Structure formats: C-alpha cells, structure tokens
C-alpha cells in the first residue's frame, strides 16, 4: 500500500463523503447522519491525496454476506484523477483481501463511462456482463402454475451438499454471468443467498424431474426497500428448453405475491436472451443497465 491511499479518520469523513458522492456539504452531512443512524459502517471509507496532501479521490467498500463487498468510488473527471483513483482502488483491494474476510469485490459501472471502466480494469477488475435490472409489481394477480407430469416444485429445504450440487449444475453453460461462479467458493455463494434480505426458506423453490433436482429459484424479501428479489434463478442443462423455466418462475412469483412488498426485482445478463424473453413475458420491465465488474482473490478467469 502506498502512503497516499489511506483509510479516512472519523473526523475527516464528511469531506471524504463529499468527494465520494459528488455532493455538497449539506447533502453529504445528511448522508453521514443516515449512515450512522442505519448502522452502515464507514470503516472502509478511503481517500487518495496528492503530493500536497489535497483530497483527489475517495472510495468505500461495503461488506456483504458470503465474503463479498461492493465498491463505490468518487466521480472521475479527467485522466489525472483516473490514475489516482486506480492507485486508490488497488490499495483498498489489497487491504480488504489480505485479512481473508473478503474473497470477491463487485462494482456496477455506467455502460458509457469509458474512463471509469478503464480505471476498474486497470485496477484488476474483470468485466463480467452488462447487467439488466428488471422490476414488476408484486401486487399483480399471480396464480400457481398448473401441475406437470413427473415435475415437483418444493420449498422443503434440501441438504447443503445437494443444494451446492444443484447450483453447480445450473452454472453449466449458463448464459447468465458465466464467469462469476468461478470467482467464488460454492459455500460462500449459498451463504450469501441465505443472508441476503430476510431469509425465508419457504420462498426458495427446487424443481425436481422424476425426483432429481433440476432447477432452483431463490427469492428473498427486503422489507426496508418494500421489495422482493429473485436473487438466483437457474435450471440444470438437462432441464432447459422444456418450458420448465416458465413453470418455475410462475411458482416463484406466486409465492412472492403472498408477501406485502410492493415490487419484485431481478437482474439478468443482457446476453441471456431466453431469460430476458421469459421475464418480459411475465411483466418485468427494464429499470437500469450497468456493467458488472468483479475482482476475486481466487486465481480464476472467465
């Protein structure tokens, strides 16, 4: 770590947040109060100073379940600032991964911000996908799918070993962020899903064909945001192209609609045309598009 990239002392958090958020002091002060009120840690708020000691960039790492973290960086306006921000990110990443608590750091960038994306890739991040966020009302009429021969939809929990095996099968030749699963340990992925939002095993569904686990839908609830989220949705390779994706999704939406939350969200790789068509057919609309980038402590590639 170089001596110009440093964690921010508590007394200096307000100016660092101004730089990070690109907002004026009054607005940043309200954000700081909100962070403190909601218990959001700022221990991983970092700054980059120039040779004169002036603040030139800021970054924040927020830890997430499953040994992951999300990165936020200050706006980048020119090449000089880009170079400084790259050095800041490298120092933050080195520090975060060195203690063994974080294996994967994720960033969502603007598709047309070439300077920002170059900074992330120069800092070691991998461009995974153009991620499409979609939303639909959770108050729409949702009916359970009709029964299919030899197909069972169950929310009865299965053993971790069986779930990890099923998840691994759904990653095979997947069109949805195909490189991401290689950057994490399977148990961390499962733990992350369980700790995302308010975990309710009754909102998780396993699809079985003749008693064999063949697909999974993981829905989590986030009351604070008044929403549900399809955190993961996938079919094993042998179960695809049989109409079972629609069958599983309809069941997941039926379960979600029993909850009081206003909306239901999901994210999908823009290259996953079959999934985009399925979600659109069920009333999901595109909200945002972001470039998903990641940096892993594991020696893997996409």
Regions found by a protein language model. Give the residues of each.
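A short beta-loop-alpha structural element at the N-terminal edge
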Residues: 1-17, 150-167, 172-176
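Active-site rim helix/loop that mediates acceptor-substrate recognition in acyltransferases
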Residues: 21-51, 60, 180-213, 218
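Conserved donor-binding loop and adjoining core beta-sheet/short helix segment
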Residues: 32-96, 209, 217-228
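Acyl-donor-binding surface of acyltransferase catalytic domains
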Residues: 79-150, 155-157, 293
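Conserved acetyl-CoA-binding loop-helix of GNAT-fold acetyltransferases
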Residues: 81-95, 235, 241-258, 276-281
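Conserved hydrophobic beta-strand within the GNAT/NAT acetyltransferase core sheet
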Residues: 105-109, 230, 264-268
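Conserved active-site alpha-helix within GNAT-family acetyltransferase domains
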Residues: 111-129, 242, 246, 270-288
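C-terminal "cap" of GNAT-fold acetyltransferases
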Residues: 132-151, 262, 267-273, 288-302
């Amino acid at each position: 770590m170089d001596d110009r990239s440093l964690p921010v002392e508590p007394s200096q958090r307000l100016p660092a947040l101004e730089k990070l958020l690109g907002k004026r002091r009054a607005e940043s002060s309200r954000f700081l109060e909100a962070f403190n009120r909601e218990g959001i840690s700022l221990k991983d708020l970092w700054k980059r100073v120039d040779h004169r000691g002036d603040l030139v960039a800021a970054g924040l790492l927020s830890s997430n379940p499953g040994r992951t973290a999300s990165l936020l960086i200050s706006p980048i306006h020119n090449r000089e600032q880009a170079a400084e921000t790259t050095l800041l990110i490298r120092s933050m990443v080195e520090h975060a991964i060195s203690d063994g608590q974080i294996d994967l750091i994720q960033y969502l960038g603007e598709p047309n911000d070439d300077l920002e994306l170059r900074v992330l890739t120069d800092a070691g991040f991998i461009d995974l996908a153009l991620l499409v966020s979609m939303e639909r009302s959770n108050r729409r009429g949702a009916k359970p799918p009709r029964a299919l021969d030899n197909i069972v939809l169950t929310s009865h929990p299965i053993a971790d070993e069986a779930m990890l095996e099923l998840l691994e099968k759904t990653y095979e030749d997947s069109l949805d962020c195909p490189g991401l699963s290689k950057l994490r340990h399977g148990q961390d992925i499962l733990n992350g899903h369980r700790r995302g939002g308010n975990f309710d095993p009754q909102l998780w569904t396993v699809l079985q064909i003749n008693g064999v686990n063949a697909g999974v839908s993981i829905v989590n609830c986030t009351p604070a945001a008044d929403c549900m989220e399809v955190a993961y949705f996938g079919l094993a390779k042998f179960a695809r192209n049989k109409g079972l994706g629609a069958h599983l999704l309809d069941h997941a939406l039926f379960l979600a609609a029993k909850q009081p939350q206003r909306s239901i969200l999901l994210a999908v790789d823009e290259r996953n045309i079959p999934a985009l068509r399925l979600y659109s057919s069920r009333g999901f609309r595109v909200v945002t598009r972001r470039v998903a980038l990641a940096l892993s402590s594991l020696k893997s590639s996409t």
